[in-house]
Amino acid sequence: MHIPDGYISPATVITTYAIALPLWAKAFSELKKNLDEESLPLLSSLSALSFIIMMFNIPIPGGTSGHALGVALLAIVFGPWVASLALSVVLFIQALVFGDGGISAFALNSLAMGFSGAFSASFVYEKLKQKNYSVFLAGWISAVASSFVVALVLGIQPLIAVSDGKPLYFPFDLSVTIPALVGSHMVFFGVVEGIFTKIAYGVLEKIDSKALHAKEA
């Protein structure tokens, strides 16, 4: 789901960075308020776990790929703002060091996989936290919401075309991106994300229940 350089127009790049910059600033402010010596090791560990699982990409139709995120687990434990910033840092390192995702698309990738994933997961978990399926559903919705943002932005890129109608950037429209990305995440990648989140949450709960609920302390 990492969008590389060259897939989105300059106008899209500028717009996504304009949206992301104040959100990053707010997230950094929340991080400074909530991070302490006790929670830092867990945040670092979960961010590293997210980094690792996102490196395993599975190609899907429509010119992109799918993978697990780990952002739902971060959002449940630390809240959506800290989770969004943590995933943004992970995405930046992946783009800069491994070329997984473009620098021009970094803001869009962060908005999709970081902010959309974290806030959708946090919302679902908080609304259904008394239900035993809340953690799974939080993981599932984080993947689906992220894929929808990516599919939507990529799907409108063909509107930017030369006079003969040939797209200048990403060539597939919404009729391809929505079913390819959102559909695959609803039936497969989201389920994988939900299972991963549920298992990881259960492991953390057994190891250190206090640390697991750090954001509620």
Per-region residue spans from a language model:
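Hydrophobic transmembrane alpha-helices
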Residues: H2-P10, I14-T16, A20-L73
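Hydrophobic alpha-helical transmembrane segments
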Residues: I14-T15, L40-S45, S84-S88, L111, ...
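Small-polar-interrupted transmembrane alpha-helices in polytopic inner-membrane proteins
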Residues: S47-F51, V82-A95
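Interfacial aromatic-anchored transmembrane helix boundaries in multi-pass membrane proteins
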Residues: I58-G62, V89-S120
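Transmembrane helix-bundle signature of multi-pass membrane transporters/permeases
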Residues: S84, L91-F92, S110, F115, ...
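Short helix-perturbing small/polar motifs within transmembrane alpha-helices
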Residues: A112-A151
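C-terminal transmembrane helix-loop-helix hairpin of multi-pass membrane proteins
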Residues: L137-W140, K166-A217
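Juxtamembrane non-transmembrane "cap" segments at the membrane-aqueous interface
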Residues: V144-L168
